[in-house]
Amino acid sequence: MLLPETPALLALRQAVRAWTVAFEPRRRVVVALSGGADSLALTAAAVAETDSVDALIVDHRLQPGSDAVARSAADQALALGCRTATVLTVDVAEGGSLEAAAREARYSALRDARTDLPVLLGHTLDDQAETVLLGLSRGSGGRSIQGMAAFDAPWGRPLLGIRRSVTRAACVDLGITPWEDPHNNNPEFTRVRLRHEALPLLEEILGGGVAEALARTATQLREDGEALDEYAEALLLRAVVDGEVEVDTLAEAPTAIRRRALRAWLLQGGAKALTDKQLRAVDALVIDWRGQGGVAIGGGTPEARLVAARRRGRLILGFEDRRRV
């Protein structure tokens, strides 16, 4: 399909072209297509700027008629020039956050179906701004407000510098009607309220440019974070001996680098859903040692908990029988 040369479509093509040059020299990609404006616009630009595009459409089966929506998205993908368009049906786990469960099911299906290709996602600058605000609300440090990466294999996000208004304009230019997901207007979801209430209010109070400023901040923090991670990795290489960490080597490092090294070591050892409180408690074993006991870390089993402890000048990580607690 030959795309018209409108400002919106040219901006999208430039964004996809830049992403491809940086991350996918093979010029072969998969696009995660919902049928919404963002992913449709991304699909059109990807077809124009790469050699091969396969579309994957996930049917969460959470709404009546979702199968028809998925089939329509597949038809649109083929009309735009995708090589293939495949509908993936998933089961969304009940209980807890519906939004989180749907996301987990969707990403799992996309990961399984992508073969060895990167999966392009239609996240825009607006999505990035919302992600930063959500991270701020958690208050868990700079990592939580770094936002989404342009490429976090296998996930690619070429449109992080593109406003949502541009993707909608592109769909108008293409003469295609995007699907409007009812969940995107459901105030039960925190992100929806940020989108429709919090961000517009901030724009009004602060005089505009808030979304761009939040996205710019995320980029700067991610660049800083990547540099700190490199220093932390080098520190960990020096400190780890037979899977254990020498306390004296860690204690010499600046706090930001030391805690990043500890976080990496804990995650490598099987920690799950590591909290700031847990990380600080493990850090205290290094810099505030008073003979305290080990620190329980998420990632254990029903029978045993994962514990970080200090023994003979080293940190060790192992399982402890819950019946002994």
Curated annotation (Swiss-Prot):
ATP binds at residues 34-39. Its EC number is 6.3.4.19. It holds the Pfam family TilS. It catalyses: cytidine(34) in tRNA(Ile2) + L-lysine + ATP = lysidine(34) in tRNA(Ile2) + AMP + diphosphate + H(+). Keywords: ATP-binding, Cytoplasm, Ligase, Nucleotide-binding, tRNA processing. One of its GO terms (biological process) is tRNA modification. It comes from the Bacteria. InterPro entries: Rossmann-like_a/b/a_fold, TilS/TtcA_N, tRNA_Ile_lys_synt, tRNA_Ile_lys_synt_N, tRNA_Ile_lys_synt_subst-bd. Coiled coil: none annotated. The N-terminal region contains the highly conserved SGGXDS motif, predicted to be a P-loop motif involved in ATP binding. Ligates lysine onto the cytidine present at position 34 of the AUA codon-specific tRNA(Ile) that contains the anticodon CAU, in an ATP-dependent manner. Cytidine is converted to lysidine, thus changing the amino acid specificity of the tRNA from methionine to isoleucine. This is tRNA(Ile)-lysidine synthase.
